[in-house]
Amino acid sequence: MAETFLFTSESVNEGHPDKLCDQISDAVLDACLAQDPDSKVACETCTKTNMVMVFGEITTKADVDYEKIVRDTCRNIGFTSADVGLDADNCKVLVNIEQQSPDIAQGVHGHFSKRPEEIGAGDQGHMFGYATDETPELMPLSHVLATKLGARLTEVRKNGTCAWLRPDGKTQVTVEYYNENGAMVPVRVHTVLISTQHDETVTNDEIAADLKEHVIKPVIPEKYLDEKTIFHLNPSGRFVIGGPHGESGLTGRKIIIDTYGGWGAHGGGAFSGKDPTKVDRSGAYIVRQAAKSIVASGLARRCIVQVSYAIGVPEPLSVFVDTYGTGKIPDKEILQIVKERFDFRPGMISINLDLKRGGNSRFLKTAAYGHFGRDDPDFTWEVVKPLKWDNKVQA
């Protein structure tokens, strides 16, 4: 077999303080868009012991009860007492929300006067989309497994299977791969790491046994596990204090977990709490759809797409495609197909991906367990656009 290498991805579950903040920011966005689809939202959240603060710039016609959103989100995650890290009903909630800067408003949407195709990017920046044929989701296996372990931790906590679990937790998976002419082929899972918050009553042996039986076994396919797989299960020995009591949280600090687990590339912009004029979010969504469509259409086995913007300018400054040598046709021809089939103007992304639609916890759902590779009709950017290319090859 070809020479192998190890690659690691991590995840955190919904009770991690940073992820709590992402979810509150996106719950605010959902509430604004549900009443006013043209809401302009840049909502940040921070938290520490017994306190949550929501702050930022929001221009909306919606009537939003920010404090209620904070408390409901914390409660739904499981932060219902100081013992578990935060008491949703009794913590201090601070709100400092102002209107969007009029300078930004005139440059981006002309104070709501511009047509969709004229709407400029809400800021400069560059975003990346990635796809790989190593999983059905067309996502990296290391990232998929780490993310699913985190989601499973929450599931067995909430359904009572592992009643000793508390909301906070982190996961990490190391996969052994080999490189098949640019495509990534998983061989086995090398290491599984889980650190989960727990109550005082459970022993470390019970934690390890339950995690193997109820979390790891249902998530990681047997074919990837062998007698050499290493398990680190709560390696610190104690994780009773967690959530915002254990450490502070802030929106936008888990951007690799939100995307591709360290694969591909990242332009640095976070997603949560941002309406679709913010290309950090909408730009990243459209390039994921482009990359996924390239792989799903058989144009390449693995692919990255970059787009970049200037504030106030609708058209992207650049679009880039790299198939890591796995393309069936030259990358420049794939780039041409992408430019013909995808509209990268922010106003048109909003329409084509229906990003102004709030409600149904639409963006809240994205804020835990990843924005990509999810099988949910609200994740419109995961819909594959068929890309026709046979004719071009023959030509």
Curated annotation (Swiss-Prot):
PROSITE patterns: ADOMET_SYNTHASE_1, ADOMET_SYNTHASE_2. One of its GO terms (cellular component) is cytoplasm. Mg(2+) binds at residue 10. K(+) binds at residue 44. It comes from Populus deltoides. Binds 2 divalent ions per subunit. The metal ions interact primarily with the substrate. Can utilize magnesium, manganese or cobalt (in vitro). It holds the Pfam family S-AdoMet_synt_N. The lineage of its organism: Eukaryota, Viridiplantae, Streptophyta, Embryophyta, Tracheophyta. GO terms for molecular function: ATP binding; metal ion binding; methionine adenosyltransferase activity. This is S-adenosylmethionine synthase. ATP binds at residues 16, 168-170, 236-239, 253-254, 270, 274, 278. Its cofactor is Mn(2+); Mg(2+); Co(2+); K(+). Keywords: ATP-binding, Cobalt, Cytoplasm, Magnesium, Metal-binding, Nucleotide-binding, One-carbon metabolism, Potassium, Transferase. PANTHER family: S-ADENOSYLMETHIONINE SYNTHETASE (PTHR11964). GO terms for biological process: one-carbon metabolic process; S-adenosylmethionine biosynthetic process. Pathway: Amino-acid biosynthesis; S-adenosyl-L-methionine biosynthesis; S-adenosyl-L-methionine from L-methionine: step 1/1. It is found in: Cytoplasm. L-methionine binds at residues 57, 100, 278. Catalyzes the formation of S-adenosylmethionine from methionine and ATP. The reaction comprises two steps that are both catalyzed by the same enzyme: formation of S-adenosylmethionine (AdoMet) and triphosphate, and subsequent hydrolysis of the triphosphate. It is an enzyme of class 2 (transferase). Belongs to the AdoMet synthase family. Homotetramer. It catalyses: L-methionine + ATP + H2O = S-adenosyl-L-methionine + phosphate + diphosphate.
